[in-house]
């Protein structure tokens, strides 16, 4: 019954309910926490991003467990929210913070996630996966996307991540990407993706490449 009651909260809350939700989550433990977090996210959702941050940060600052509020900060996703979650990542709430960092929809997360991928072996491949999604949906030029995919591919150890990066390199349609993905045709695990990327690039550049 209690879980159902918390779930029902999700759709009937507004910014004025955050105080009550904060009291609930501070007392709660276990399986009901995600429902209360979702209710908190919904409560501030109508507000602009900066206002979402300003509304929730007082509760973060006075909480004995700031990570309870990371999903709300991740939804806000402004630079201050990112900085606050990173403080937890570099402090006592590494995994809780990382789980929220990969849900932030902000182009500034590209560099943050790359640095995590370089320095945090446990979370490297998940960080690269999210990094790749953000680069793909960004407004960067094809050359810039090639550069960002290339550096990720250099440190990717998971074959699924490698193949995804190779596929996206193909979508840049650049000569530089063609030269790079050809190197992956000799590896059985990446050969199929590399061959497809080569075909994609060549089909878009047949005149330029002498086809």
Model-identified regions with their sequence ranges:
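Amphipathic alpha-helical scaffolding segments comprising HEAT/armadillo-like alpha-solenoid repeats
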Residues: 1, 14-26, 47-60, 78-89, ...
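Alpha-helical, heptad-rich or low-complexity scaffold/stalk segments
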Residues: 24, 99, 125-133, 160-167, ...
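Long beta-sheet-rich domains in secretory-pathway and surface-associated proteins
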Residues: 156-158, 175, 193
């Amino acid at each position: 019954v209690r879980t159902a009651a918390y779930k029902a909260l999700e759709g009937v809350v507004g910014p004025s309910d955050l105080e009550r939700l904060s009291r609930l989550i501070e007392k709660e433990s276990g399986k009901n926490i995600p429902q209360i977090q979702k209710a908190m996210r919904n409560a501030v959702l109508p507000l602009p991003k900066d206002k979402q941050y300003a509304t929730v940060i007082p509760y973060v600052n006075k909480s004995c467990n700031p990570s309870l509020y990371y999903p709300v900060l991740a939804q806000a996703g402004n630079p201050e929210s990112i900085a606050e979650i990173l403080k937890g990542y570099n402090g006592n709430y590494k995994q809780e913070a990382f789980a929220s960092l990969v849900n932030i929809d902000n182009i500034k997360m590209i560099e943050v996630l790359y640095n995590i991928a370089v320095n945090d072996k446990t979370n490297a491949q998940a960080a690269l996966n999210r990094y790749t999604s953000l680069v793909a949906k960004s407004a960067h030029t094809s050359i810039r996307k090639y550069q960002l995919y290339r550096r990720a591919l250099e440190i990717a150890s998971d074959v699924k991540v490698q193949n995804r990066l190779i596929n996206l390199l193909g979508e840049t349609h650049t000569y530089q990407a063609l030269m790079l993905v050809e190197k992956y045709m000799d590896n059985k695990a990446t050969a199929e993706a590399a061959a497809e990327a080569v075909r994609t690039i060549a089909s878009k550049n047949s005149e330029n490449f002498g086809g």
